[in-house]
A protein has these predicted regions:
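Nucleotide and nucleotide-moiety/phosphate-recognizing core
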Residues: 1-73, 83-98, 105-113, 123-147
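Conserved TIR/SEFIR loop-to-helix hotspot centered on a Trp-containing motif
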Residues: 76
């Protein structure tokens, strides 16, 4: 993929998945996570994408560390980034690659916030494996490959 450009309050790169493959655009919002919709909403409008063609990769504390699941739509689970995306995309019915990061021992909102915003507690190799699995699932979704 080409070097990203600054657009839509984020870093955007466009290209194909391979020779003759589908065109894709990858947007990495440069907003705070809880304002990601400010980036994704205008990008979706500019590309005139149907909502089910928008894929969001996000952390998921309701999944154990290492699990990666894909689904269309669903609840927000208290995730402020998803709330922002729903608001600015107009609906929660976008594709999601849910990356399990596990839940902290405390349910206190401040502890949960510190957990998801803090450094990884798992060994570097396990984190690299998780990122690779998330990338694989995202590629399957984009290429429409059944599981």
């Amino acid at each position: 993929m080409p070097r990203p450009k600054r657009r839509f309050a984020g870093e955007l790169t466009e290209g194909r998945t391979g020779p003759g493959g589908p065109r894709v655009a990858i947007l990495r919002p440069q907003t705070y996570m809880n304002e990601a919709g400010r980036s994704a909403g205008p990008a979706r409008g500019s590309y005139r994408l149907e909502l089910d063609r928008v894929a969001v990769i996000h952390d998921e504390i309701e999944l154990p560390f290492g699990d990666v699941r894909v689904r269309l739509g669903g609840g927000l689970g208290g995730h402020n980034g998803l709330r922002s995306l729903r608001r600015d995309l107009g609906s929660p019915d976008f594709q999601r690659v849910r990356v399990g990061v596990g839940r902290p021992p405390s349910a206190d909102p401040e502890a949960v916030s510190a957990y998801v915003l803090g450094k990884w507690r798992q060994p570097r190799g396990e984190v690299a494996d998780l990122i690779e699995r998330a990338a694989d699932e995202t590629e399957r979704l984009v290429l429409d490959i059944p599981r």
